[in-house]
Amino acid sequence: MIEFENYTGSESLHIAGFQVFKDEEIKESISLFSTDLKWVSRLSHHNDIFRTKLGDIKQIQNLDFGVLNRLLAKLIDAEEFEVLNNQYFCKPPNYKMTSAHQDNAYFDSDDNVFTFWIPLQDVDLLNSCMFYVPGSHVVGLLPHKIIGTNVRTRTGKTGFSLYSDWYNNSEFVKVPMKKGEILVHDKNTMHFSSPNLSDDYRIAITCIMKVTKWKY
């Protein structure tokens, strides 16, 4: 079994390609999302809900996080930005890992795109935390393979996930987090999340943002 090193937080987003932030104002805002999955579900259209093969809600796309998006933009010094997608992820108990990939493999953009990943509970190796290859964002977009894993509710259409085996597992570091912390990564940073081996759902929200104007 591989022993992954822990993220130390000593390197910046620019150097490592990812960074964990703590912000009390954002912590209050995201607490609104941590109470009731059904409440969040009502904010979405049925076509935006993906389910696992067992029928569990896996993710909900195209949510409106409003104020939260503006608060997150401040963390990376974005003066103007465009929200590409907001998602709500609900990883069921005893559910598989999310394979290693770069977010940019999904949209292949030359723009400055960042993903904010915000757990709604403490996360660690047991209940599925994130893993990154530090500095991998500077390499650019790498080859990926398509894996069909998601089923969109009502339409029955299968979505797809992408996988890359470019890096060895030993090159990843694990990033355990506390509820209220915010993780941001570059569009080209290689990452995956471990299986949820706990008996509870692991819930997180993501905000994918394109910076159109920096403060500096």
In which residue ranges do the predicted regions lie?
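Residues immediately flanking
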Residues: 23, 102, 120, 186-187
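A short beta-loop-beta micro-motif enriched in histidine and acidic residues
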Residues: 101-113, 177, 200
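Short, conserved beta-strand element in jelly-roll/cupin
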Residues: 108-125, 208-212
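Double-stranded beta-helix
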Residues: 125-190, 214
